Amino acid sequence: PVCEDRAIIAAHKAREVYKHDIVLKFANQTLKGVIEPTARKWFDIGSEMVDMIGGLPYRDELDYGRGLEAMDILLDTAKSRGIMCHVHVDQFNSPTEIETEQLCDKTIEHGMQGRVVAIHGISIGSHSKDYRYRLYEKMRQAQMMMIACPMAWIDSNRKEELMPFHNALTPADEMIPEGITVAIGTDNICDYMVPLCEGDMWQELSLLAAGCRFPDLDAMVNIASINGRKVLGI
């Protein structure tokens, strides 16, 4: 509801100008959620103008305790339009977050296997090894893919919570050997949250490899190339 449809209209104009040079895919982001009526109105309008449905269930969980309902709305919309769904989950490096697991359950419930992509998954590393590997099995059942955005939360604040020692990154070193497709993204570019993030995919990729201690060059090439196409459905 902040920018209404102005940004996506401009984006479509840009896509038309550069259509011979690059393939552009658009997704929305529900920074104000999908529960509040005005936010829902603009979500419904915007969902007709994008190539994949994007969402942030934490917004509605924080404001209304209705994060699971928000997932239902996102997945229902994506399914009805026959497009993929990209959902930001487990962003805050906390063992209290289980959004990736919840999204797996909702993906299967809505029959959206292979059409849902989780973004971040940072808090997965804060859980026990037993939980993590049970989650990877559930991700395989849901055919869920993951987009890592390493710069987004590498500056995680110091905490007094007890959790397994790890860096605040998507655990790509565990996911990839478990058969989960991992791609790379950025969230966000030189904004007030991450002012030093330049949107450079090499910066993101090198941080992921170093931070996960995962110098598998073949896997990194896949993350930067074919896996990116998979999560975009191209």
For every predicted segment, state its role.
Residues 20-28:
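Short beta-strand/loop segments at the ligand-binding rim of alpha/beta enzyme cores
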Residues 84, 105-116, 168-234:
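His/Asp/Glu-enriched, well-ordered alpha-helical/loop segment
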Residues 92, 123-125, 152-155, 189-191:
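Short, catalytically relevant binding-site loops at active-site mouths
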